[in-house]
Each structure stands twice: as C-alpha cells, then as structure tokens.
Amino acid sequence: MEPYAAAEGGGGGGGGGSTDTGLEESMWRMGLGGGGGGGGEAVAAGRLPERPGEADCVYYLRTGACGYGENCRYNHPRDRAAAAVLNGGGKTTHSAEYPERPGQPVCEYYMKNGTCKFGSNCKYDHPREGSVQAVMLNSSGYPLRSGEKDCTYYVKTGHCKFGSTCKFHHPEIGGVSETPNMYPPVQPQPISSSHPYQHLAGWQMGRPPVLPGSFLSGSYPPMMLPSTVVPMQGWNPYISPVNQVASAGGHQTVQAGPFYGLSHQGPSAAVTYGSQYAPLSSSTMPSSSSKQEPAFPARPGQPECQYYLKTGSCKFGSACKYHHPQYLNTPKSNCMLSPLGLPLRPGSQPCAYYTQHGFCKFGPTCKFDHPMGTLSYSPSASSITDLPIAPYPLNYAVAPVAPPSSSSDLRPEYLLTKEFSANQSASPGTTCGPAGAMLKAYAPHMLIRPQTSGAGGMVTTHGGEL
C-alpha cells in the first residue's frame, strides 16, 4: 500500500500511471480517489457528457458514476462536490430540480401538488414561475379538489395513503345522520287515578304466560310495554294474547289466551275448548280489498318459477319469464288459521316444508295448505278432564277415577298380579286413601284395569273411597 499511496501523492503523474493499470477507475468509483491533483475526477468528467442546460445527473452526484455513460442526457459537472451541495446533497430525487421542457405538456401532478415523484426523470414540463395553486385541505388534512373525482379509498375508509399529494377530491365527512323514526310518536294519554301505577296507566301489561302470577307480589310492577311502541295484540299469530286479571288476594295473575284451541269461557276458572280454527285477522293478513296481489304470468311451455313455488310470490312480477301455476293464486282473505297459527287452504297444494318438519317458516303468509290430520283430541269437548293428558306413565294403564258415592258397591276395584298370594290380606296402606297412596305402596306395573270380579288366580283388593 505504501507505493500506491506514494503514487497517489504524486499528483497528476500518479493518476496517469494508475489509469494505465486500470485501478484508477475502480478506486474512483469507490470514492477513494483523492490527492491534490484530483486526476481521477478529471478523467471521469472527461468521459461523461456535460450538459449545462440540463439537470444534473442525480446518480452521478451520488456515486460519481453513470451507467448510461456518454448516452446520458443529463449534466455531469466536473466539480461533483459543489454540484451536490447546490442540489441539496443529491440524496433524494425529490430534492433535485424538476426539468423545464417548454415543448412538452405540463406535468399535471406537479401543477397540483408542487412536487413530482419522477423528479428529473419526468418527461413533462415543470415551469418555474410557481404556477402551482395553493390547495385547500379539509379537516383531516387531505386536499379539496372540487373539479376532480372523489377519492374512493377515502370515501370508504376515511383515510388516504397519498395524503396531501392525492390528485382526487376528499370531501368533508359529515356528522352522523340522525336515526330515522322507526316508531310513531307516542301521544299522551289520560291517566286514570285508579290505576296502581299512574305513570304507566297508558301501557299494556305483558308477561310470559308460563310465569304464574303468584310468583310476583302485587307491590312489584310487572313488565309493561306501551301499546303505541310494540303492538301486543295480533302482531304475531304464534304468540297467544295475554289477559290481565287481578285476583282477590292482591296478587296479579296472568291467564293465557287461546293456545292450541283453548279459551276461557264464562266466569268459571275451568278452561274449556274453544272453536277449532281461529279466523284470520286483518292485522296479520292483508285483505284483497286493501292490497291487490300482483298478477304473475302463466307460461305453460316454460319451466316453473322455483321462487314462486317456494314463497308464493315473485319479485320480477309480470316480467318473469318462467311459468307461474294459477292454482297457487288462492285468495288469502277467506282462509282460516289452524291452532298452530298456520293457514288452512283445502283447495291448495299441501306445504312441503310443513309436511316434512311439522311447522312452516312462512307462518300465516304461506299460500299452501297446512292440514291438521295429526291431532288426536276432540276440539268439541266441554271439559278439561277430557284432555289427552296422562298423569301417570303412558305405558301403564290405570283405571279412571270414579265419582264419589255413598254406596260401597260403586268403589273401583284394583287387581293385583299373581306375585301376591291369594290368602294375603291387603295392608291398610293399599286399601285406604287416595290413588296416590296406592301408587306409592305398589309399583305402577302391578296395577291393571279394574274388573267386576276376580278371575284366574288373581285376587281382588278393594280400594278406599277416592
């Protein structure tokens, strides 16, 4: 290294010797060339073109070399250090001077933002007269350009990755719009002084029918819903109406309305069967007079509209190109609702969904028939004792309870199985007391239906009066 250092210190002569060996160019590119003579830079400057009217080659100012060589169209000054200081050190392309090309179109990006991401490599004109107009920014710091299109990214997300240099319009994001009124305004109603809760006098009682009223004391108000906000009557056919009845003991009780054909009749507490089918109310089903059904075209030669077959309607209306069978256009106003709340249409096609699952997701709006062929009880019965309710296990047949009578001959007889001896006397726990006591003493499988007389190795045991 000492001979090379001496040669470098020799000035121009050393530079010429190193050029012959080929080491001068390599050392000059690495920025190690120096000395008083500066022969390395003089040689490099002589090889690269000097164009005083053009912008300085940024790559040359950074590295001291240019890959384009003599074909580079930019200026390569001999004093590279001084040119780098004038151009801001030559660290970024944005700090370089933008070229002026009078014969070329004006750079739109430069005219809007005052900068150009292509720098000196841009092929458009960048006038120096400061023709860049000041751009107004919105509250978020993004430019407002009324004549341009809205920035789609900003409209969707509220942000823009280009910031103030974006060439699109960024409108002000307005405040949150007021929520539209989903419910009608509540009108003040007169308050009755006899109501236990005067501020809730205009509201309607609402309590699940499965919750007995005896669990809630009269001093606690039940859940109430204003009738103007949530209509309780008839808004959903699957929910039975609720009737508020005040008991004499001070407790508020709730009695369930018609459910599966049950209804309250008369002042008695017994629940009897009502009518078999409930008529369809106008609140749950629009009538033909108030709303006329759209006419769907019948095209026998075309495939059937699957959406129409499933829902009974077609969103395309008369413009639909598929076939709409006319037998599905049954009037809705003349149908009846079954105890399940589903329409009965004897002349229509049975609902396939109801046939498979036992219920219909379309409810009373379904246009198909929902037959009630699976109900085994008689809706014309007049007493709740005739309900098909088994107080004991269903696989055990127990004799029905006989009416009370003073005669001992009318008492029911229970037969014991062969497991008990004929000479064994019945214990008091089995012959006296109600049927529940007998069931506690003997298992249900040991009891069979009563007979008038014993037969075939079986012993008759007389029960007590029930």
UniProtKB/Swiss-Prot annotation:
**Cellular component terms per the entry's GO annotation:** nucleus
Q: Which sequence ranges are marked TM in the entry?
A: none
User: What ranges of residues constitute the C3H1-type zinc fingers?
Assistant: 51-79, 101-129, 145-173, 299-327, 345-373
Stretches of Gly residues bias are at 8-19
Could you tell me which PROSITE patterns the record lists for this protein?
A: ZF_C3H1 (PS50103)
Q: Where in the cell is it found?
A: Nucleus
Its protein name is Zinc finger CCCH domain-containing protein 5
Single GO molecular function: DNA binding
Positions in coiled-coil regions? none
Q: Which SUPFAM superfamilies match?
A: CCCH zinc finger
Classification via Pfam families: zf-CCCH (PF00642)
Q: What InterPro entries does the record tag this protein with?
A: Plant_ZF_CCCH (IPR050974), Znf_CCCH (IPR000571), Znf_CCCH_sf (IPR036855)
User: Which Gene3D superfamilies does its entry note?
Assistant: 2.30.30.1190, Zinc finger, CCCH-type
Q: Which keywords describe this protein according to UniProt? A: DNA-binding, Metal-binding, Nucleus, Repeat, Zinc, Zinc-finger
Q: Region Disordered: start and end of each range?
A: 1-26
